[in-house]
């Protein structure tokens, strides 16, 4: 029977990044997913690498800054191996914040009204009590990113099993021995639960994640407007909506945060609300047409911090619970979990994110 050094449960951006990274260290890696790679939370994400967000938990900020800084090299290596572009954009973010919100991110500066008019002429001016800032942030297309990660992992020799849900983590002599699906057993000395919102469903030691639903909308230019200049060049973030331009002229509008269990349906009222909020900021979006709407299930932990590290079962690790920051944290998560699994020196103290904090 074939064996692996590590089995990763979940082929989202976290599982794919970790599998690719572990394989580069020489480990024999298997990734198992209940569906298709990158088709759950990662597929639904907006892709903002928003390390300057003032609402990030303080404990998470050092990790977000480090992971955001890793992105250019991460994508460069990924493109070399996959021959696919994840559409990494570095135009930056224009953020409208309520006065008094602290924006202490290096490189942030106030956006003057005349500058906004010159750089983003389609935008309305911020209302009274709201300030505008330029943030040194990037964005990426998560669907293209996961496609590139899947191809790079396969290129490296990572095994991937799709359409097969892991039901149990197998245990022998007090440590992990592999995983079990309805039809097969997969032996490994290391197992990593990267199953996102579904991480709690894998026994034993189900991790305390729950789904946090987020609805998003995609608008595209009318057929006759495709040759015109893009409506916006920068990511635009307000307290009510964020607007994310893609290089192919699509614009994403998001997003809700809902406690709706595993329900991934969209509703017309929410789609219309997001659309109207975007039109209020960028009136020309009203001339575009709604192309698609979808919902994803973010993996939320009880304290909204990621769950990273070894569980109480030797050899059984967790890398989940990234909530709204999985895309941003993927490069660093893969690096830190690889360091932990291979016994290398850790760049960051992972104790605040340990699965054992919920014991």
Question: What are these model-predicted stretches?
Answer:
Residues 20-24, 47-49, 84-89, 185-186, ...:
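Active-site substrate-recognition segment that forms the wall
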Residues 47-122, 128-129, 277-279:
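Dinucleotide-binding Rossmann-like beta1-alpha1 core, especially the glycine-rich loop
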Residues 2-14, 30:
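Beta1/beta-strand and adjacent pyrophosphate-binding region of the FAD-binding site
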């Amino acid at each position: 029977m074939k064996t692996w050094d590590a089995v990763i449960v979940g082929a989202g951006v976290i599982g794919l990044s970790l599998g690719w990274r572990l394989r580069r260290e020489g480990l024999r890696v298997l990734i198992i997913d209940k569906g298709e790679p990158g088709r759950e939370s990662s597929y639904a994400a907006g892709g903002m690498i928003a390390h300057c967000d003032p609402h990030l938990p303080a404990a998470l900020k050092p990790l977000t800054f480090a992971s955001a800084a890793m992105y250019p090299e991460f994508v460069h290596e990924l493109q070399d191996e996959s021959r696919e572009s994840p559409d990494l954009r570095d135009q930056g973010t224009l953020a409208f914040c309520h006065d008094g919100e602290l924006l202490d991110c290096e490189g942030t500066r106030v956006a003057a009204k005349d500058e906004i008019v010159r750089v983003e002429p389609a935008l309305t001016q911020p209302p009274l009590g709201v300030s505008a800032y330029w943030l040194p942030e990037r964005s990426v297309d998560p669907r293209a990113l996961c496609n590139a990660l899947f191809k790079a992992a396969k290129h490296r020799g990572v095994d991937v099993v799709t359409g097969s849900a892991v039901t149990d983590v197998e245990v022998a002599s007090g440590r992990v021995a592999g995983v079990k699906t309805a039809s097969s057993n997969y032996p490994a000395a290391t197992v990593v639960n990267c199953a996102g919102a579904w991480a709690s469903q894998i026994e034993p030691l189900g991790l305390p994640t729950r789904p946090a639903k987020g609805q998003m909308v995609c608008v595209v230019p009318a057929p006759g407007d495709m040759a015109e200049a893009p409506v916006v060049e920068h990511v635009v973030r307000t307290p009510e909506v964020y607007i994310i331009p893609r290089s192919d002229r699509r614009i994403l509008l998001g997003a809700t945060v809902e406690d709706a269990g595993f329900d991934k349906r969209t509703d017309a009222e929410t789609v219309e609300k997001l659309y109207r909020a975007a039109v209020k900021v960028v009136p020309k979006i009203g001339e575009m047409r709604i192309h698609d709407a979808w919902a994803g299930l973010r993996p939320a932990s009880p304290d909204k911090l990621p769950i990273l590290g070894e569980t109480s079962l030797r050899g059984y690790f967790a890398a989940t619970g990234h909530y709204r920051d999985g895309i941003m944290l993927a490069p660093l998560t893969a690096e830190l979990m690889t360091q932990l699994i291979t016994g290398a020196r850790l760049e960051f103290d992972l104790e605040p994110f340990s699965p054992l904090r919920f014991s």
